[in-house]
């Protein structure tokens, strides 16, 4: 079959390593006589680099539900969310997001117990996102049904779902998730600080931040052949633009334990980046918070976030920290933009194609994000005119 992105999941099942190919070509019979070998340049033998994209928190508040509802078709339309920023997630080899809602089914609801229509995750997937992180403080909002139906719907759609599990055996078989992309193996780990005081229903598993467990997960990921290990952590304090000491300590510990890079979420605002250099001279990127993608939150900095691009396994960069870049975007509420639905506008988007009210709002958001990022280690800033790998 054909698909936009070709990569394989590597899962540990019992004592066997099973390769599950997401895009497989028909097998061809081997020729009776091997053709003469043709000299190949060294560069052609090396695997192609991997282009990664990370997005922040995919929220779904009550006003978003109402704005997305199509009363004529009796369905929900979330495609406007990604109309102007979906190009990047579609071009990436792997695009990762934090799905901070459950897919319990009807009745749908916003804060404080999120239950979103299936159309929401389908729109996110249609925008090019392949990896859905589900270990966050809202994953237990709707109990067992919310957790298990979310898992089932994402997996049934052929998406990589990471962070919550039906039971302990499900976790053993599926975690850590190791993917083979362009000849490279990479693993995404996902953990949350908590679940708003809710506990998993007996049997269900949520990946909480537990250093003993995480250390074992890193070892297991490497044993499965992971060349790169990236930890995606739900942590920090909401609406605070700088990481706290707990975040910094955990990031440093993760790197010391063998994680290559750390990407954070939960504060719902952008937080700066840090490059941690280990004694072997390797540089490891930590981005403490990507902010929101779309939400109806009201505090300064909630109405947008940043997309983080990264290149792994490239000869053009000494490490991923060298090749990393970010682009800010703003997602105004319809009552401010005059649009029917929520839509994200990236930095540098043509003013002539935006509502008049959005021109200044986008500029203000970008300036705020730039100010926040200036407090950390520098990574390249891009915009609509020069974004990409």
Describe the residue ranges of each PLM region:
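Bacterial N-terminal signal peptides
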Residues: 10-18
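Bacterial N-terminal signal peptides that target proteins for export
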Residues: 1-10
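Acidic, metal/ion-coordinating pockets
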Residues: 24-389
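C-terminal motif of bacterial Sec signal peptides marking the signal peptidase cleavage site
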Residues: 20-22
